Amino acid sequence: MMKKPVVIGLAVVVLAAVVAGGYWWYQSRQDNGLTLYGNVDIRTVNLSFRVGGRVESLAVDEGDAIKAGQVLGELDHKPYEIALMQAKAGVSVAQAQYDLMLAGYRDEEIAQAAAAVKQAQAAYDYAQNFYNRQQGLWKSRTISANDLENARSSRDQAQATLKSAQDKLRQYRSGNREQDIAQAKASLEQAQAQLAQAELNLQDSTLIAPSDGTLLTRAVEPGTVLNEGGTVFTVSLTRPVWVRAYVDERNLDQAQPGRKVLLYTDGRPNKPYHGQIGFVSPTAEFTPKTVETPDLRTDLVYRLRIVVTDADDALRQGMPVTVQFGDEAGHE
C-alpha cells in the first residue's frame, strides 16, 4: 500500500521535470532567436558609352575606387560637337521660317503682287484681242489654221499667267494658310528635337560613374573604336551593402520587412554588423546550392534582402554571413 503513493510522487516529479525542461528549452529558443545563413550580395555593373566613337582617354584603372559622378573616360568629342553645331543651325532656319509664316506678307510684297496682276491682265487682254482678230482673218481665209492655233495658244498661256498672279495676290492679302503655319511649326519642333538629341549625344560621349564602387576590369584602351553600348569597365558596387539569406515557411513570420538583425562574419565573430530586412520574396523557391544550412537544402524557402546599416570595407562581396534574430537585434 505504501508503494502506490511513492509511485505517484515519482510520476509527479518526473512530469514536473519534463514541464520545466520543456519550458527551459522553449525559453532558450526564444532567447537565442532564429539564425539564418547567407552571403554578402555580389553586385556588379558593366559601364559603357551610350554612343559610339573613338576612345580619347580613360581616367581609372583596375582596382581603383570610384565615386558617383566621377569622370571615368571620354570619347573623341569632335564629331558630336560638329553635329551639335549643325542642329543649332537647323533650329535657326526652322525658327526663321516659322516666324515668317506667322508674320504674313509685307506691304511691299503685296504691292508687287498687285502690280504683277495688272501686268498679267494687260498681257491677257492683248492676247485675247489678238486671238479675236486672228479668228476673223482665218474665217476670210487670210491666215492659215496654224496661225490661228498659235494665237489661241498665246491667249491660253496669258490666261494661266493671269490666274497664277491673281492667286498669289489673294494669298498675300489673306496671309498664310493654317496648314502651312502648322507645317512650319512641326518643322521647328523636329529641329528642336534633333538639337536636344545632339546635346545628349555630346553629353553621353563622357562616361560618368553612376555610384560608388571598385573597378574590377578595364576592357578597352585609348584609341579603341567602340560601338554604342560596348563594355568599357566592370564595376563592383560598394554601397549599399546587401546580404542575401533564405528562410523557411515556418519561420517566415519572424522575417518581416523592417525587422532588425545582427550579422556575424568569421573575421569578427564578437563584433556584429547591424542590418534591417528590406525585402522578402513573395514567392517560394527551392533552396540554392550556396545555402550552407543542411536542414534547409531540400526545403522551399523565401529569399531575404538585408540592408547592412553600418557596413565597412571589411565586408566583402560573396562573404558568408550569419544572420541572428533575437531581442538584442530589436524591431523597427
Swiss-Prot record:
Name of one Pfam family that matches: HlyD_D23
Keyword Signal: yes
Keywords: Coiled coil, Periplasm, Signal
Signal peptide limits: 1-16
Database matches in InterPro entries: CusB_D23 (IPR032317), UPF0194_membrane_YbhG (IPR022936), UPF0194_transport (IPR050465)
Domain of life: Bacteria
Coiled-coil blocks: 108-209
An example Gene Ontology CC term for this record: periplasmic space
Localization annotation: Periplasm
HAMAP family named in the record: UPF0194
Family, per entry: Belongs to the UPF0194 family.
Protein name: UPF0194 membrane protein YbhG
Source organism per UniProt: Escherichia coli O1:K1 / APEC
